[in-house]
């Protein structure tokens, strides 16, 4: 992760919104460089750490919150739950998301695990913690990313524009008090450990569109190639 101003790395709207925590982002860059110096790699690749903030702040209408990046090398791309188009097999959480996508919307299974088309529709795929050590889930929790992502969520809420927050799992649900009057869809996490406890059948995609329509906003076209 390069030591450059946020305005050179992310969307202008996000650069302004995250200005109060820019020094924290700088500190996290220093932390990641120290990890490398100690012989520890991190995921995703440096140029993708802030990728969720490269899509326009003003266009976000659905927020999907993840926990931290996939710890498997080659999987994490800087967008929660998404992977690069060539990744096979898919992470099991994403497999479960696609199962619910099929059952909720009636669409065929997407050809890849790349969720970028959702981001281009105004769906923000944000992890609470933006980096992880390979093979060690949750290894960067409590290291300093949480104030950054919480600032981002407060900025989304402060716009007072139609938005639906989709919170999968207990970690994501702790953000609910920060969301104010934002419409929220909550369920267990799509992980194989919890998906059968209420994620399957929760219909997050169609419910998000129903809520957006009730607010007078355009629904999301969830179809993936």
UniProtKB/Swiss-Prot annotation:
Catalytic activities: Hydrolyzes single-stranded DNA or mismatched double-stranded DNA and polynucleotides, releasing free uracil
Q: Which Gene3D superfamilies match?
A: Uracil-DNA glycosylase-like domain (3.40.470.10)
Provide GO CC annotations from the record.
Answer: cytoplasm
Q: What class of enzyme is it?
A: hydrolase
Q: Where is the signal peptide?
A: none
InterPro entries cross-referenced by the UniProt entry: UDG_fam1 (IPR002043), Ura-DNA_Glyclase_AS (IPR018085), Uracil-DNA_glycosylase-like (IPR005122), Uracil-DNA_glycosylase-like_sf (IPR036895)
Q: Which GO terms describe its biological process?
A: base-excision repair, AP site formation via deaminated base removal
Q: Where in the cell is it found?
A: Cytoplasm
Give the EC number: 3.2.2.27
The reply on keyword Ribosomal protein is: no
CDD domains found in the cross-reference section: UDG-F1-like
Asked if the record carries the keyword Cell inner membrane, the reply is: no
Q: What does the record give as the active site?
A: 68 (proton acceptor)
The record's GO molecular-function terms, alphabetically, read:
uracil DNA N-glycosylase activity
Per UniProt, which keywords does this protein have? Cytoplasm, DNA damage, DNA repair, Hydrolase
Protein task: Excises uracil residues from the DNA which can arise as a result of misincorporation of dUMP residues by DNA polymerase or due to deamination of cytosine.
Name the family the entry cites: Belongs to the uracil-DNA glycosylase (UDG) superfamily. UNG family.
Protein name, UniProt field: Uracil-DNA glycosylase
Q: What lineage does the source organism belong to?
A: Bacteria, Bacillati, Actinomycetota, Actinomycetes, Mycobacteriales
